[in-house]
Structure formats: structure tokens, C-alpha cells
Regions:
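Ferredoxin-type iron-sulfur electron-transfer modules and their immediate structural context
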Residues: 1-54, 58, 111-126, 183, ...
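Iron-sulfur-cluster electron-transfer modules
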Residues: 35, 63-162, 168-180, 326-396
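Basic, glycine-/proline-tolerant helical and adjacent loop/strand elements
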Residues: 50, 56-81, 87-88, 92-108, ...
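Short, well-structured alpha-helical interface segments that form or flank functional binding sites
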Residues: 143-147, 263, 267, 298
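C-terminal, active-site-flanking charged/polar segments
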Residues: 145, 157-161, 167-188, 291-302, ...
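Short beta-alpha junction loops
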Residues: 164-169, 194-198
């Protein structure tokens, strides 16, 4: 009946009975998640959620109140779609992590890779593989991103053929971007996609090695965007090849800062978790590298000043400056008028002084503290209080 009498049973006996009756399911965790670089995790504003949108089941859900991603690995169908659309690389494919993929790609040097889903029905295919074509079986047909594709292309030095009837949106956009890049550089397509047997035969007959495209790099411990940037920088090779349009799923952009209103509070730097915006302590400036920017817009939302930082999303510029840090804003440090220690930027001090000075109603001590470091502020105020007490005592 599903009812059990537990009267007279000890706690251990009850627990053992529940364990015996509870169903047990075995499942694999196909996705690895790094919350430290996730662009949804604990953000004040929702700026990303592509993985949830890409998931065909309820394996990934958003917890809007805490801005946490909730994973149900038992509901995962192992398609890998979430991995291909993750902009920062916070999601990685556990079956073939990026580092493992790079090592496997090295084995394809001098070969033309034919990517085939492990679940594909190959028995009914009547296809003869040309010389130098080597199949690459993948269990998740939609995990391939632009980083995976460029890694395989450069390590092999040849075009890549994908045989997949229902290619994922993230992988489709990645193929489009990589093809644009190769057409500008080599005047050749990089990836040939075949969705049926006839197209597969055609793609295999066309696939070839691309002279001057083979390149190997160590990807260990590098984030997703930086891997792609390093490989792309080598391909550009100091030339100006033009621009590549990007999509909503794979976004790039450039950040601009109005130096007249920027106080170098570094809120934008703290908001950027992919290190596209960095504070340069040597020059006391904010520098920006567009090749790793995901165009999330969180820097705009985090800026304390009005009309100061602007994001211009849309394209990848195939030129040397796209891969280097450029200065967006700079200011000199302000020295404490008491001890001479530099403690803040000049613009920040001047802005606070302009706001607070009218509120201090000519109080010389308080006005002085606006230009002092934290240590000297206290000293100035204590001295002012002691002087006031001394004056009151002397005046009776």
C-alpha cells in the first residue's frame, strides 16, 4: 500500500528502511561550472543567461533572487549547447574539457578532421573517406564554440568537416564567425557543414589543407576568450584584414570612456570578470583589451558617473590593435596636504570637495579634511576639537 509502520523502530532502522525504498539513479555530470567568471552569478543586473536559453530541458535554471544558476545534471541530455554559448568560458564540457580538446586536436596535425556525433547512425551511410580524413567522434554535438573550432583548424592546418543534421545555434554562429575570418585571411572556408549524406560526400571531396594555417599554442590555464584571441592574433600577423560581424550569442565590442567625467573610481574594472578592463597602477590609468571583451555591458551599469562609459558592440577587428591594451582614461594622484601621501585621484578628490564644501558652511577644519588622507582626516578633526575646547576654557 506504500504505508509503513515505524512505531517501535529505532532511528537507524527507519533510516535503513527509507534508504532501501528510495530509488537510486545513476547519471553523469556533463558540464563543469566556474561561478567566478560567470556573467550571471551574483550580478546586480541580469546581463547574461544564454546557457539557460540554450538548454532544451530544465538542466539549467536561473534563481533570480540570488542570481545563481541551478543545475540538475540528471535532466541534462548531454547536447553541450550551453557550453557553446557561454561567453566567458564559465561552462566547460566535462566529456572533453577545453584542455583535453586541445591535446586531441594536436593528434590531427596533417589530417582533415571529420567531426561526427557519437550517436549518429553511421551504418546506413555509404561514404568512402578520402585519404588523410580522420573522424573525430564527439558525444555532445552542440558544445563546439569558436574557440574549439579555431583550435582544431590551426592544430590540423586543414579545413574541418562537421556532419550533423541539427547543428546548435551557438555552434552555427561560431562556424559563421570562423568562416568569415578564414575567408578574409586565406580566401577559403574554414568549416564545411554537412547535414545529410549527399552534402557530406560533397564536403569531403572539397576539404583540403590550408597552406600557412597550421599553428600550435599551449592553452593550459587560459580562459576561453584568451585562447581564441591568441590564436587569432597569430593569424592576423600584424596585418589589417578587415572586420568580422558577430552575433547576439557571440558578442564582441569596444568600450569608450569620457575622460572629462571619469574619476577613476575603478567600478568598471571591478565589474569586468574577464579582464578586458584593467587598472594600470604604473600609469594610474584604465586600459582595455577588446579581444577578450564579451560586450556584456556590466561596466556601463556599474559606472558611478553619468554618461561616462559606453559600450559599442558588434564586430571583431582583424588588426593588431584589437589584441593589445589601449588607454581609455588617466588621472594623476592627489597628495594629502598634511603628510604628502598620495591616496586618491585628483578628479575624485575634486568631485567630493565640490559636493561637500557647500555643506560644511565655511568650517575650515572640515574643509581641510576634504584634501587629507584617511589618517590625517582624523588628526585634523581631533586637533580642531582640542583647539575649540582650549579656546572655551580660556574664555571661561
Amino acid at each position: 500500500s506504500g504505508c509503513y509502520e515505524i512505531a517501535g523502530k529505532s532511528d537507524d532502522e527507519i533510516a535503513a528502511m527509507l534508504d532501501a525504498q528510495s530509488p537510486k539513479f545513476k547519471f553523469k555530470s556533463h558540464v563543469h561550472y566556474d561561478s567566478t567568471i560567470c556573467q550571471y552569478h551574483e550580478r546586480r543586473h541580469e546581463i547574461c543567461g544564454r546557457c539557460v536559453e540554450a538548454c532544451p530541458t530544465v538542466a539549467i535554471l536561473k534563481e533570480d533572487e540570488t542570481k545563481h544558476l541551478v543545475f540538475s545534471h540528471i535532466d541534462c541530455v548531454n547536447c553541450g549547447g550551453c557550453v557553446s554559448v557561454c561567453p566567458s568560458g564559465a561552462l566547460d564540457y566535462s566529456d572533453i574539457p577545453r584542455n583535453s580538446f586541445a591535446e586531441i586536436a594536436k593528434l590531427y596535425r596533417g589530417k582533415i578532421a571529420l567531426i561526427v556525433p557519437a550517436k549518429a547512425n553511421l551504418e546506413n551511410l555509404s561514404v568512402n573517406l578520402p585519404a588523410n580524413v580522420l573522424p573525430f567522434a564527439v558525444s555532445g554535438e552542440r558544445f563546439l564554440s569558436e574557440t574549439h573550432l579555431l583550435t582544431l583548424l590551426q592544430e590540423s592546418g586543414a579545413q574541418v568537416v562537421i556532419y550533423e543534421q541539427n547543428i546548435g545555434k551557438g555552434t552555427k554562429d561560431a562556424v559563421d564567425i570562423v568562416n568569415q575570418i578564414y575567408e578574409l585571411k586565406f580566401n577559403e572556408k574554414a568549416v564545411l557543414v554537412a547535414q545529410n549524406e549527399d552534402k557530406l560526400k560533397s564536403a569531403l571531396s572539397q576539404a583540403k589543407f590550408i597552406e600557412g594555417s597550421q599553428y600550435s599554442v599551449t592553452e593550459y590555464a587560459l580562459p576561453k576568450r584568451e585562447i581564441f584571441a591568441r590564436r587569432l592574433e597569430w593569424l592576423v600577423d600584424g596585418q589589417n584584414l578587415g572586420s568580422v560581424s558577430t552575433t547576439e550569442l557571440i558578442r564582441y565590442g569596444r568600450v569608450e570612456i569620457n575622460q572629462d567625467t571619469c574619476t577613476l573610481c575603478l567600478s568598471c574594472v571591478g565589474a569586468c570578470n574577464v579582464a578586458a578592463l584593467v587598472a594600470d597602477k604604473k600609469t594610474n590609468s584604465i586600459v582595455f583589451n577588446p579581444s577578450v571583451c564579451t560586450a556584456c555591458g556590466y561596466c556601463e551599469l556599474s559606472c558611478a558617473e553619468k554618461d561616462t562609459i559606453f559600450l559599442r558592440p558588434g564586430k571583431i577587428d582583424l588588426e593588431p590593435s584589437f589584441f593589445t591594451f589601449s588607454e581609455l582614461a588617466r588621472d594623476e594622484l592627489f597628495a594629502c596636504i598634511e603628510c604628502g601621501k598620495e591616496f586618491a585621484t585628483k578628479k575624485a578628490v575634486e568631485k567630493i570637495a565640490s559636493i561637500m564644501a557647500p555643506r560644511f558652511n565655511g568650517d575650515k577644519a572640515k574643509l581641510k579634511t576634504l584634501y587629507c588622507c584617511s589618517d590625517c582626516k582624523a588628526k585634523v578633526m581631533i586637533k580642531a576639537q582640542m583647539d575649540q575646547m582650549r579656546e572655551e576654557v580660556l574664555n571661561g
